[in-house]
From Swiss-Prot:
Superkingdom classification of source: Bacteria
Protein's UniProt name: Delta(1)-pyrroline-2-carboxylate reductase
Family to which the UniProt record says this protein belongs: Belongs to the ornithine cyclodeaminase/mu-crystallin family.
Species this chain originates from: Colwellia psychrerythraea (strain 34H / ATCC BAA-681) (Vibrio psychroerythus)
UniProt-recorded Gene Ontology molecular function terms: oxidoreductase activity
Job description of the protein: Catalyzes the reduction of Delta(1)-pyrroline-2-carboxylate (Pyr2C) to L-proline, using preferentially NADPH over NADH as the electron donor. Together with LhpH, is involved in a metabolic pathway that converts trans-3-hydroxy-L-proline (t3LHyp) to L-proline. To a much lesser extent, can also reduce Delta(1)-piperideine-2-carboxylate (Pip2C) to L-pipecolate in vitro; however, this activity has likely no physiological significance in vivo since C.psychrerythraea probably possesses no ability to metabolize D-lysine via the L-pipecolate pathway.
Record note on quaternary structure: Homodimer.
The entry's keywords: NAD, NADP, Oxidoreductase
Activity sensitivity to pH: Optimum pH is 6.5 for Pyr2C reduction and 10.5 for L-proline oxidation.
Amino acid sequence: MKIISAEQVHQNLNFEELIPLLKQSFSRPFSMPQRQVYSLAPEQSENHDAFALLPSWNEEVIGNKAFTYFPDNAKKHDLPGLFSKIMLFKRQTGEPLALVDGTSVTYWRTAAISALASQLLSRKNSQHLMLFGTGNLASYLVKAHLTVRDIKQVTLWGRNAKKVSKLIADFSILYPAVTFKTSVDVNAEVASADIICCATGAKTPLFDGNSVSAGCHIDCLGNHMTDARECDTTTILRARVFVDSLTNTLNEAGELLIPMAEDAFNKDEIVGELADMCKTPSMLRQSSDEITLFKSVGTAISDLVAAHSVVEKLAD
């Protein structure tokens, strides 16, 4: 059995290959039982420490991703808040195949799924990306979206002005053909965006849904809690809503659960899952002026596919 490091993951993944591979994999048969997330916090505590198991399999490989989530690690212990490993087994024999660093895979597959949804739902002539969030995912999300759309401008919003400035400087060097700027007036920038990508730990909506322009595509991927959300009810009601997994989002995503609790939105109004999107092009964008929204909380099958891709490359 191989032990595959984060460095090996980064060396062997790229969005030009991973995005179409994920689309292909979501179009084929796979199984993905509901993931199990266990709270490690005492009852009535505001602590959000958790342990999770995410199983899945397809015709080639079986996988189980395990991760721990300790959000206070950074300020208390100077450690990352997330640790993860992905165990892979051969589908035909059950033989252990590899233990892959899961944190690095998560960055790649999260950004790749976000960009895949944008490729499927955003207007083909989309040029302005509005990115909320300056965390580890930011660089992956920019690179992934530049892979699927001819982005000319990226507006970056973050609570930490120094981090925003640093990222803009770094991105400007990496992608000199793209204009990078900081957000001064959030709702004004939202109004001019073709694609809005939200990757934050926000507890409350990041922008006014009335500011979203016709034809915009919105991607919310940062929140996994039932009582938090990155977009407001107005945004949900104005959009055709798609999700990565019905089971997972209806158990975790406040973006959907809060409007449902308000009796403003019904789960039957969700157009479809990512697998449906990949297999049925007719269900995608219906007009140039409709607003689309993709809510993702992560899927085990995307972890499986990305991790297996690394294993196969290292075997060549």
